[in-house]
Amino acid sequence: MISEIYSQFLNYPVISTDTRKIIPYSIFFCLKGEQFDGNLFVNQALELGAKFVVTENSSFTDHPQCFVVKNVLETLQILATNHRLELKIPVIGITGTNGKTTTKELITKVLSQKYNVQSTVGNLNNHIGVPLTILSITKEHEIAVVEMGANHVNEISELCTFAYPTHGVVTNIGNAHLEGFKSYENIVETKMGLYDAVIHDSGVLFVNGKDLLLVKEAKTRIETSFKKTGHNNTQIQFYGVDQDPFINGSVTAIDPYLTIQIFDQQIKTQITGAYNLDNILCAASIGRFFGVSDAQIIEAIQSYAPNNQRSQVKMLGNNTIIADYYNANPTSMKAAIENFMMINASEKVAVLGDMFELGDFSSDEHEKIVNLCNEFHLETYFIGTHFSHLKNDTTHFFESVDKFKSVFENMHWNKKTILVKGSRGVHLEKLFE
């Protein structure tokens, strides 16, 4: 059955999973979700122009445009694996606690100066998104950049069985999704699934030389592989260190845009956050490895402008908004606050939303953020039930963004620099609607 589906996929190489966004002559996969069951929309998909439908609905067994399978999701994943094995191009896998999407976009921007690049759309980085990304790669593409996310143990290793990365980047490892991982050690081991996959095929790892954990893990895992097999040709390209790195650089200003020194030049970017220096150096390192010129790398970095509520600078009247509310965890929240305090601005305010998926660690991690803001004497407005449990007389707490919005709209702030950060589920974007 898989071979038949793949044969048709080669003729109609577009996948659809949502009848509201169906593409004519695509193959519709009837995926199940918490709120929907695609198997209920077979006829609708065909009426809207799907060429074929992959479904678990046995009543369509004899339909000439339907493939009836036991498990649609597994079929999608196997199809992606088969397609990946037919591709003869570099596939760069990216994971990490923070910075995955920004790094992915920077790498794509840099490599696109020279190559036809396909990369993960948005943050489709899970057990559905990674197969869809692989299946979107065509024979015209020369390099693929695949983002991989995880919220439970061993998930990255699973995603690598679809992507088969030849090159790998772990941006960093911090506390996130602790509800699913249960411990920091489990987070480390899960992220290292990418290193293991690349090492297995003697690929190339791009490693932040300042991150001692990543350096140790990369070297140790290569040595372990060599002892087991007797051979391993995995390369490590270090970036961000002073001792003969592939690429290094430094932050020279944050106003709030980030200015960096790289290739003996000052470059002003369109993103904020000193923490983004590592992401830029990673992209530059990969660009140089693949033969992109330094001038092209600089052009790509300067022209990259985020529009995804990550490290984004906006204006609200004459106030400057640091919009970083796509997601949040303890590590990224701490980094955002510390970076915010480095910005050259006279009047600063922080609007911080809850951090989700922390399980039993939630109360302690939220309290650490409140204490950090108090240490900086930062005027802060905390939003969400997790922060509200820590309510005291000296800090501003609001149970929801809706309760804060009316207050926010009547602040009449003037020439303030405002950090807005929190988990997606807090819906901080409502403040600007």
List each model region and its residues:
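ATP-dependent carboxylate/acyl-activation modules
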Residues: 94, 308-310, 425, 429-430
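Phosphate-binding loop of NTP-binding sites
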Residues: 74-205, 209, 213-232, 263, ...
